[in-house]
Amino acid sequence: MTDKNTSEQLWTGRFTEATDAFVEQFSASEHFDRRLYRQDIAGSMAHARMLAEVGVLTAEERDRIVDGLTRIREEIEHGQFQWSPKLEDVHMNIEKRLTDLIGEAGKKLHTGRSRNDQVATDIRLWLREAIDGILDELLRLQAGLVELAELEADTIMPGFTHMQVAQPVTFGHHLLAWYEMLVRDQGRLEDCRKRLNQMPLGCAALAGTSFPIDREQTCSELGFDRPTRNSLDSVSDRDFAIEFNAAAALVMTHLSRMAEEVILWASPHFGFIDLPDRFCTGSSIMPQKKNPDVAELVRGKTARVHGNLNALLVLMKGQPLAYNRDNQEDKEPLFDTADTLRDALTAFADMLPAMEVQREACYRAARAGFATATDLADYLVRKGVPFRDAHEIVGRAVRYASDEGRDLSELELDELQQFSGTISEDVFEVLTLEGSVAARNHLGGTAPAQVRARVAEARDRLRLLMGK
């Protein structure tokens, strides 16, 4: 009988038989959590330096650990690291390799910590970096929309409610509506980043540690705002992952709405835009097809992000304090959401500013649905007609024009006057599309002057955020 651990696993002292081979495969996570290796190594280096400061490690042991971890990072980056599912996860794979490289000092690294606080720290570090990358792409998309909005500040298109022509708007105004969605998304992601930037390291398994650790030191080295305040909560909390996924689900919802409009606009029935060939695909059977696959995929991938949010919520809803192995299942949906969101933003940041707006088609569509009917009602109100009466009068005029196959602006003055004697020659000034959009010249309105003012504000804001 020997007390020497001959297994690859680093926790077998209490066990009398080897882990079942299927259970090893079933419970291993190294095939997906290995992408945390940089964060895991950074956390271990900070932990080793802190242990040396408080006298748990010698300076020589600290240096050997840091050097060994540096070598392991290089091995992983160069594809030379041998991952083993028998070691379960990224943490044990790295620790085992460290011990193989430097000997006994490697076995001391885990003093004063657990995989519970270790993985919680790793995920926060990883997600913090992922959010930064996502925000970069989000800002790039915002900037592209703002530039296109300026180009299309005077372009008139139909605005829709219930997918029916409602009132004329400018294309630039519509693009700035997308921009406003993304500004809110940015704020949610930034708030999420602030809340996740607290360090669990040092909370150990669930109760803390009896070693004289200095959590403020590791917190500072790893760039966290502060250490967490309760060890039980720290190792079991996945709020930050859920919050990120909720924010991501909203971003994807907005991108999906944009995608739906792009798909409609690119169809021959609308013809509002032409997408560059590089963002489209063809058909294996129909030679004429130019399919907006990028937009369709963004719309489709929204479903998986929504599904990931639900998976995380359901994962956490029944767990008692503190850490449970269920939490291993947090990483794949989290990784997938971050990857999917960043890819979708990259695709749209490249594609949407490259849309070629078909201005004449937009204008024709705006004229086709009596889009200036509200302007005629407003005209009557300014002439002293109560709004409800004006609404009724214009409704009858629209029905007449529809039966005649003409727009309101194409009716003769005497035809309009049969519906209200208050109508005079000046009515035609308000029945043009140009007059309609120009009249909405107030903060938030669709007038070209307002679009340009909002573009200037947005450009100043983005210049500060992007350093350009």
UniProtKB/Swiss-Prot annotation:
GO terms for biological process: arginine biosynthetic process via ornithine; L-arginine biosynthetic process. Pfam families: ASL_C2, Lyase_1. Pathway: Amino-acid biosynthesis; L-arginine biosynthesis; L-arginine from L-ornithine and carbamoyl phosphate: step 3/3. It comes from the Bacteria. It is found in: Cytoplasm. One of its GO terms (molecular function) is argininosuccinate lyase activity. GO terms for cellular component: cytosol. PROSITE patterns: FUMARATE_LYASES (PS00163). Keywords: Amino-acid biosynthesis, Arginine biosynthesis, Cytoplasm, Lyase. It catalyses: 2-(N(omega)-L-arginino)succinate = fumarate + L-arginine. It is an enzyme of class 4 (lyase). Belongs to the lyase 1 family. Argininosuccinate lyase subfamily. This is Argininosuccinate lyase. It comes from Alkalilimnicola ehrlichii (strain ATCC BAA-1101 / DSM 17681 / MLHE-1). The gene is argH.
